Amino acid sequence: MSAALLLATLLMTGLGQVAQKLTVEHWRLVAADGWTARLRSPWPWLALLALGLGLLCWLLLLQRVEVGSAYPMLALNFVLVTLAARFVFDEPVDRRHLAGLLLIVAGVVLLGRSA
């Protein structure tokens, strides 16, 4: 159950980050149309929903797991969001990024083993 809540937290908060980026990309296109056009976009609402669900999953997870064990696992969001940046937004990801991501994963594995 804890692993499922952690995965749900990661996926929802990662989706929320992607939706926030999609929000600002859309807002650039409709900037001249004012706030009404901006708020008609589905992206900010998806961001709010995903981040809200991520918070709910996180709170449920904290009922079952110590924060000192659970919180480092959220670093995996750096990995998820970087992959989304690469494949959704076609942003460059170089060797430096990949090395950093590998270090994050190694740190999460190391901390996960001691938990």
UniProtKB/Swiss-Prot annotation:
Belongs to the ArnE family. It comes from the Bacteria. Its main location: membrane. It is found in: Cell inner membrane. Heterodimer of ArnE and ArnF. It is a multi-pass membrane protein. Translocates 4-amino-4-deoxy-L-arabinose-phosphoundecaprenol (alpha-L-Ara4N-phosphoundecaprenol) from the cytoplasmic to the periplasmic side of the inner membrane. The chain crosses the membrane at residues 42-62, 65-85, 93-112. Pfam families: EamA. Keywords: Cell inner membrane, Cell membrane, Lipid A biosynthesis, Lipid biosynthesis, Lipid metabolism, Lipopolysaccharide biosynthesis, Membrane, Transmembrane, Transmembrane helix, Transport. This is Probable 4-amino-4-deoxy-L-arabinose-phosphoundecaprenol flippase subunit ArnE. One of its GO terms (cellular component) is plasma membrane. One of its GO terms (molecular function) is carbohydrate derivative transmembrane transporter activity. Signal peptide: none annotated. Pathway: Bacterial outer membrane biogenesis; lipopolysaccharide biosynthesis.
